[in-house]
Amino acid sequence: MKPLSIKAEEISALIKQQLEKYDDKLNVNEVGTVTYVGDGIARAHGLNNVLSSELLQFSNGSYGIAQNLEANDVGIIILGRFDDIREGDQVKRTGRIMEVPVGDQLIGRVVNPLGQPVDGLGEIKTDKTRPIESKAPGVMDRQSVNQPLQTGIKAIDALVPIGRGQRELIIGDRKTGKTALALDTIINQKGQDVICIYVAIGQKESTVKNSVETLKRFGAMDYTIVVEAGPSEPAPMLYIAPYAGTAMGEEFMYNGKDVLIVFDDLSKQAVAYREISLLLRRPPGREAYPGDVFYLHSRLLERSAKLNKKLGGGSMTALPFIQTQAGDISAYIPTNVISITDGQIFLEADLFFAGTRPAINAGESVSRVGGSAQIKAMKKVAGTLRVDLASYRELESFAQFGSDLDQATQAKLNRGRRTVEVLKQPLHKPLPVEDEVLILYALTHGFLDAIPVPDIQRYELELYDYFASNYNDLLDVIRTTGDLPEEAKLNEALKNFNEGFSISKK
């Protein structure tokens, strides 16, 4: 047997090679220990350098967000299920804040607040993410709202117009048509180059399913993302859902696109935040909400804006919902959100049950953007509509006490009844803006004064068909220029239609 020959040169070459490859960087993680877990909340000891809102990872792979930074421990809200997290488990810092996937790949999908698909259509392949919390655009980054966002709902586009980049609160009791209003607005964005995001917070799974089916039926899911945090989810998921939806919208807004985001509804988010705060032992304030509940909504809604040309001119229009109790809009959360937004649409239960749908109370509803968010034609026909409606409501209450009314008062009452009837609209039938202008022009110029109230809805439908067949050029003028066609031609066309319209026999 030959003796083993060891060559010193080979050994030194191998050692040199290993030394060159040697990585002396240590992977250091700051790790803490879970001391309490329950109700979507955990407390951990040992994370001395953790940052507020930092994303933390538990030993089982779950994530949480550092919410309370206290002297001896950290209060953490757990994202998702917490059944398999135990006292004594390790939790480590990640050094980043929570992010969600963003981009075109999310369009047409239903996702949870973490951006994970829940529609069974497979994974979402996107490598782009955005933090759920980000700074709102500053004053110099914005421009004033000057472009309308057509909802297709006559009462809104005429009385409380919404502009691209505006925040318009929709407020009312449960079952007064808030969700229907938002779905109709989303459906009306077809072909308008607007990306829509519908954030369902604490809505029943069956309700969300119906909403998604409605959007699919009208082809609206082609430009819509649905973010769903159901009532069976832990409170932290309901709390982060609106921020996740806004982050998805910001990706489009900062790329020069127009976005419409609907929060259905922020009352449930406030309740979830109250639950989290009480579990974290934060001092309760009015109605047991924590002291920073105003900031909860203001930092969310301020991220919706119309950006200036330098930043691409994109916009995000927010429609936050708030549910009231017995029509009380002076409660804590409603008054908070009213003061943050650029106006509110108040849906009244009494009007809804009396058959006025959408049940918009014109007196309580306001848009602080106003005429800037209307085309010229709409401004001309809807200018006096709000005042006329308010004076009709006033006269109507007085008219109940006596029948001896002068002719002018009687004429106002007649016009008011027809105005209320014209502003009614069936579910999921938003109108193009030229049709809205047409019927409101006919109303304000007296063409409906001789038409009995029960015939108004039939008159309206026949009017649209008549103009589409015989006077499409007049509708084209409104559609393309945004202004009224020659009034003489329009009056002539309406006069011709009225002559051929058959009034129902009593």
UniProtKB/Swiss-Prot annotation:
GO CC field: plasma membrane; proton-transporting ATP synthase complex
A Pfam family per the record: ATP-synt_ab_N
Location (main, coarse): membrane
GO molecular function: ADP binding; ATP binding; proton-transporting ATP synthase activity, rotational mechanism
Subcellular compartments: Cell membrane
Membrane topology reported for the UniProt record: Peripheral membrane protein
Reaction catalyzed: ATP + H2O + 4 H(+)(in) = ADP + phosphate + 5 H(+)(out)
Keyword Magnesium among record annotations: no
Site (Required for activity): 365
PROSITE patterns tied to this protein: ATPASE_ALPHA_BETA (PS00152)
Residues the entry annotates as binding ATP: 172-179
EC nos: 7.1.2.2
Enzyme class: translocase
Alphabetically ordered keywords of this record: ATP synthesis, ATP-binding, Cell membrane, CF(1), Hydrogen ion transport, Ion transport, Membrane, Nucleotide-binding, Translocase, Transport
Entry similarity comment: Belongs to the ATPase alpha/beta chains family.
NCBIfam families assigned to the protein according to its UniProt record, in alphabetical order: atpA, PRK13343.1
Its biological purpose: Produces ATP from ADP in the presence of a proton gradient across the membrane. The alpha chain is a regulatory subunit.
Subunit description: F-type ATPases have 2 components, CF(1) - the catalytic core - and CF(0) - the membrane proton channel. CF(1) has five subunits: alpha(3), beta(3), gamma(1), delta(1), epsilon(1). CF(0) has three main subunits: a(1), b(2) and c(9-12). The alpha and beta chains form an alternating ring which encloses part of the gamma chain. CF(1) is attached to CF(0) by a central stalk formed by the gamma and epsilon chains, while a peripheral stalk is formed by the delta and b chains.
Name the UniProt record assigns to this protein: ATP synthase subunit alpha
Organism: Lactobacillus gasseri (strain ATCC 33323 / DSM 20243 / BCRC 14619 / CIP 102991 / JCM 1131 / KCTC 3163 / NCIMB 11718 / NCTC 13722 / AM63)
Record lineage: Bacteria, Bacillati, Bacillota, Bacilli, Lactobacillales
